Amino acid sequence: MNQDTICAIATAQGGAIGSIRVSGPEAITITGRIFTPAKSGKLLSEQKPYTLTFGRIYNGEEMIDEVLVSLFRAPHSYTGEDSTEITCHGSSYILQQVMQLLIKNGCRMAQPGEYTQRAFLNGKMDLSQAEAVADLIASSSAATHRLALSQMRGGFSKELTTLREKLLNFTSMIELELDFSEEDVEFADRSALRRLADEIEEVIARLANSFSVGNVIKNGVPVAIIGETNAGKSTLLNVLLNEDKAIVSDIHGTTRDVIEDTVNIGGITFRFIDTAGIRETSDTIESLGIERTFQKLDQAEIVLWMIDSADAISQLTLLSDKILPRCEHKQLILVFNKVELINETQKNELASQFSEHIGSEIESIFISAKQRLHTDELQQRLVAAAHLPTVTQNDVIVTNIRHYEALTRALDAIHRVQEGLDANISGDFLSQDIRECIFHLSDIAGEVTNDMVLQNIFAHFCIGK
């Protein structure tokens, strides 16, 4: 595959300029066949690397466009191969004409993620760094951007390298003892090995445990909007998303299925989940929707219990019997909606009665989703309730489920090593578990990953990356 020279459009359609990437052993030669520098003299192949050359793309005698060509020589390029980048005007016609000329002269169309895959195969980055490229492209908040950038720059890779070096040192001491078992030579006492195992276990556990935070940062804090029918859940969702995502109607039971979408508030990505209203119903479809409501409630980090302020007292039993027990370890906010329908005295009475019945520690807020009253304050409450740590580019937080699974397997293996040391088992059994731990950590970096897994990972990239 790496013997082919590939090309692809690297920019989105509709922009003022467009960019085409060419990479492979014939990248400079093929680009030079269709490109003529504006200044006569040097051919493209004679230009210095890391330079921009102004000129024109020709199809025979016909000029296609005036362009800039960037030149990179192996191994000092993104892919580690000879590469060019052609920057032209953003017309889709021009871009397609240039692509056709490149393919006609020996290029083939790149597969999704093939540029980054080549960078990985050519040793420009490990697999975790390659995956971070996709995360950086998809980042939608300051936190996801910082985490992806940290991983792409090798923060996670350095942690893995240090762990593998310690484990290799560990297993070498064990296996040396096995080699000299007949001579009764001890290269490291068991207490020293146990301390080393504890040190390794602590780092792996920290990385694995960081996934609970990393996953929320990457995919959004799940917020379930729950309540009885016609409490204003769909109206609130539309306000929070600033678009008409959900159908709003006075008819009870309008929302029958779960509606989800994400939005960035205060630098944090929230995943809002609008659910079917809870009520007694004989409608089979609506009942299934209510079932899903409780499923989503269980999966949420934050629960907004929507209450129609004009009919709030009737919900106390449902709230205390069915909702509170499910929210013991969640952030629950009571959202009294339609506040325009009650006066200040009624508002104070409601707050007092709910506080007396369910406890004053439950947070509450009065809003009008329809009139957008106090919805800004609700957003501020959501940011505070998220409890996400401040993320810097130096933080190593796991956001990828593949990495998390490998870390948990590595953690299981090092736990067996600790148990084996305590039980004073034979060194050959310890060595097997240490090597298994190394295997799972190496899998994250792509050192032992099979071709099918690689193909699946890079297939999720865009064509030009």
Swiss-Prot record:
Free-text cofactor note: Binds 1 potassium ion per subunit.
Compartments reported by the entry: Cytoplasm
Cellular component per GO, a single term: cytosol
Enzyme class, UniProt record, top EC level: hydrolase
GO biological process, one term: tRNA wobble uridine modification
Binding site for K(+): N230, S249, I251, T254
Function per UniProt: Exhibits a very high intrinsic GTPase hydrolysis rate. Involved in the addition of a carboxymethylaminomethyl (cmnm) group at the wobble position (U34) of certain tRNAs, forming tRNA-cmnm(5)s(2)U34.
Family: Belongs to the TRAFAC class TrmE-Era-EngA-EngB-Septin-like GTPase superfamily. TrmE GTPase family.
Designated name of the protein: tRNA modification GTPase MnmE
The organism of origin for this protein: Bacteroides fragilis (strain YCH46)
Gene name of the encoded protein: mnmE
